[in-house]
Amino acid sequence: MGVKGQLLQDPFLNVLRKEHIPVSIYLVNGIKLQGHIDSFDQYVVLLRNSVTQMVYKHAISTIVPGKAVSIPVPAETLPE
């Protein structure tokens, strides 16, 4: 993934992690996972519920926060 993708992903995932916001993660095969984001890197997200699961980002279709979140958007990602 390019740098631009990381500029959007990282702040979004970081807010979800720091604020312990519950999330629903939908995988490309239709499976829904629920929990809290413990950690993430370039390739995986650690999702914690009763157990901790390592979910590969390429398998994720959508991440839905349990409540509205506001993320800091770097100036270079704003349209001109």
UniProtKB/Swiss-Prot annotation:
Cellular component GO terms held in the UniProt record: cytosol
Domain Sm: 10-69
Subunit structure: Homohexamer.
Family label: Belongs to the Hfq family.
Protein species of origin: Nitrosomonas eutropha (strain DSM 101675 / C91 / Nm57)
GO molecular function: RNA binding
Protein name according to UniProt: RNA-binding protein Hfq
HAMAP family for the chain: Hfq (MF_00436)
Function field: RNA chaperone that binds small regulatory RNA (sRNAs) and mRNAs to facilitate mRNA translational regulation in response to envelope stress, environmental stress and changes in metabolite concentrations. Also binds with high specificity to tRNAs.
InterPro entries reported for this sequence: Hfq (IPR005001), LSM_dom_sf (IPR010920), Sm (IPR047575)
Matching NCBIfam families: Hfq, PRK00395.1
Domain of life: Bacteria
Gene Ontology terms describing biological process: regulation of DNA-templated transcription; regulation of RNA stability; regulation of translation, ncRNA-mediated
Alphabetized UniProt keyword annotations: RNA-binding, Stress response
